C-alpha cells in the first residue's frame, strides 16, 4: 500500500513536531478494557493531520472512553471483524477489512512442524484462571518477529488466545485451537476471516486436559 510513497514512521508516544496530510494509525488491540491507550492518542493525531485512517482493529465499545472517542472522531476507522464493525458503524465512519497480518508474506516460514505450541496470554487480558505449565507466551518472550514466526513454524498444532498467534499459525498451515481473551476479539476474527482454515474454538477444560 505504501510502495513508492514517501512516509515517516513515528510512535504515538513521540508526536512532538510531527504533522502532515494523512496519518495511518496502525491496527492494534488498544481499544479494549485492559488496554485502551489509543483513546488518548487519536485526538492528538487528529489535531496534527488533515486526514486520519485507523487501520483494522478490534473495538470494545462497552468501554466508555472507547465509545466516546469513536463517537467524536473524524477518522476513517477500519474494523477487522464483524462484531466490532457492527458496534462502531453507528458511531463513526467505519469500514471492515482483514487484519493487516493477513497481507504478510509467510512463504519463507512455511514448514511441516511437529508437536504442539501452547501460547496463551500471561497479561491482564487473559481470562484463564490457570496457565498450563508448558505455556510459552511468545508475544512476550520472543525478541524479534523472525523468532516469533519460526517458533510457530516448527510446530504442527498451536493453542492460543492471542489474535496474531492464531492468524499467523493458520496462515502457516497449522491446526489452531483458540480460546477467547477478555473481549470478543479472537473468536470474532476467527469467525470473520478464518472459516476456511483448520481453526476451532475449544473450551478451557479441554485445553488443560489436552495440554497436560
Language-model-detected regions and their locations in the chain:
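Active-site anion-handling motifs in enzyme catalytic cores
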Residues: 1-212
